[in-house]
Design a protein with these regions (language model features):
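N-terminal beta-alpha supersecondary unit
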Residues: 1-33
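Residues at secondary-structure transition points
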Residues: 2-10, 38-42, 46, 143-147
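Surface "functional belts" at beta-alpha junctions
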Residues: 3, 58-147, 176, 193-194
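Generic hydrophobic alpha-helical segments
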Residues: 8, 12-15, 19, 69, ...
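DPxDG-like acidic metal-binding loop motif
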Residues: 28-59
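Acyltransferase
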Residues: 142-196
């Protein structure tokens, strides 16, 4: 059951208590900015922004895909998040630096993009794509991984802080309701989101 809005703050309190920290010990908040679950990203980003604002400390957003990549590893890493219907959110990293923009795309396109690369490792939600990896890229490595917050913290150490008030999640894709709405309102000039 997903109750992040209920369990997130108690989890943060527990983690801080387990290392004998108080909020005053923090000098920066690092948050996975997306892609990912729309609701999960909104909750995480709202919590991170609130903490950073309340404590008057820096906020740094880091890619959720980068959180799937092992820290300080050689070669091309392609983190995947299953986006349903054989689509993925994918990143392309060497030494934790992007070599191509992150994207929401069909998995077949990912295969095309990396076909000539050597020493490629797929990480993240690779399970649904193992057969295709083995068929099209038999010499490619793959490993199911979970996001690693410690890796993000290390990578964010010397990353420039984001503007607290301008920071928004990086969804990489519109929600299905917005895509459907846009199909029916292509020429009206109306905005899907109405300002109050």
């Amino acid at each position: 059951k997903k109750n992040h809005s209920i369990t997130l703050m108690p989890a943060i309190d527990f983690l801080m208590a387990s290392v004998d920290w108080t909020p005053k010990d923090l000098d920066r908040i690092v948050v996975a900015e997306g892609p990912g679950s729309y609701t999960g990203l909104r909750i995480a980003v709202a919590t991170a922004k609130t903490l950073a604002h309340t404590l008057n400390i820096e906020l740094v957003g880091m890619s959720s895909l980068l959180a799937l990549v092992p820290y300080q590893q050689e070669g091309l890493f392609v983190p995947l998040m299953d986006a349903r219907r054989n689509n993925v959110y994918a990143g392309f990293y060497e030494n934790a630096k992007p070599v191509m923009p992150e994207a929401h795309l069909p998995f077949e396109r990912v295969i095309e993009l990396i076909k000539g690369a050597s020493q490629v490792t797929f990480v993240g939600e690779v399970g649904p794509f193992i057969e295709q990896i083995q068929e099209h890229l038999p010499r490619t490595n793959y490993k199911e991984t979970l996001p690693n917050a410690a890796n993000l913290a290390l990578l964010a150490w010397d990353t420039e802080a984001d503007s607290l008030h301008d920071f928004v999640p990086n969804y990489l894709k519109r929600v299905e309701a917005e895509e459907n709405w846009l199909k029916n309102h292509t020429e009206s000039g109306e905005s899907y989101i109405k300002r109050l």
